[in-house]
Amino acid sequence: MQHPDLKNRDVLLLTELDYGMARSNNRFVARELASRLRMNYAFAPVYIALQKGSGVEKFVDGENKESIHGLALFSRYPMRNIHAISLPNGKDKMKGAEKRLGSLRALIADIDHPIGRFRAVTTHLDAHCSRKHRELQMRIILNHLENLQPIPTLIGGDWNTTTFNSQNAFRAILGYWRRVFMGIRNVAMNHFPYPDRYFERGLFRELEQRGYVYKELNEYGVGTLHYDIKSVEKNTNLRDWVPAWCFPFIFWAAGKVGGRVSARLDWFAGKNICVVDKPKTIHELRDKDGNALSDHDPITLDFVPSAQ
């Protein structure tokens, strides 16, 4: 990693890492990253994929080998008490466009850092579910952490705080019209980048009630996932979940705010964490050939564990 804001990081919390998937050339992505970065790592399988993926991924060459999808923790320092907990699915993963076996998880490890031991948690909350279900998933994680030895803790990952109830297309369509009536510009400016203000308030309230903070640990109000009406890839992926007749309405609404909409889906939350420098959201992260490395923008945080 040569990006100045990413290189030399002591700990990485990554989600959606493949092991033997055609879309990533059947690599064990976590192991390769750990080897190249010279970091320790822990990998937690999440799904066994029964097809190549969704959207544009369905058209890649080759076939899956191991067909595993998961999340990982990386550390330059020893990791201890490594374990994962399962999170309940928000819908039957065999009924969606992308058929999979398994469920999302949270991966947990204690990091023996020279400045002090702390606990790192990487998690991926459900996208195709209700907001209440994401809140439930976070509650399960927090309940588990409360049963562990109390040490400074950082939780991070893709929490899919889209503001939508996406259990099915019907609920998502109803949610679309609700946002239209609230005012397209209002929602795009005041809710998608700030899901904690209203739509996803329950999830963030759960964190705060357990003593976790999040606003000062993130570049608050800056989107990490972007939809552009001109993106063929984004629209191809969206067609797996939304009926074709919806697209003129989606284009119309997005066009009201310049054709591009950004939402904050990726977060850090911490307890007994002291921020050292301003958190950042890194836009337009690309490889040497100009290809986007992820559909989400990475987020960074410099911190030290503080006394409890």
Predicted features and spans:
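N-terminal, active-site-proximal structural segment of metallo-dependent hydrolase catalytic domains
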Residues: 1-59, 63-68, 295-298, 304-308
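Active-site beta-strand/loop signature of hydrolases that rely on acidic residues for catalysis
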Residues: 1-26, 74, 109, 119-123, ...
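Active-site neighborhood of phospho(di)ester-bond hydrolases with catalytic His/Asp-centered motifs
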Residues: 12-15, 42-45, 154-158, 213-218
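Surface-exposed cleft-lining segments at the edges of enzyme active sites
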Residues: 17-19, 87-98, 123-131, 190-191
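Active-site environment of divalent metal-dependent phosphoester hydrolases
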Residues: 19-22, 49-52, 92, 127-131, ...
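Alpha-helical elements of Rossmann-like donor-binding domains used by nucleotide-donor carbohydrate transfer enzymes
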Residues: 32, 136-141, 202
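Beta-strand-turn-beta hairpins that frame and shape the catalytic cleft
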Residues: 66-67, 71-81, 100-124, 275, ...
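Metal-dependent phosphoester-hydrolase catalytic domains
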Residues: 84, 131, 145-154, 161-308
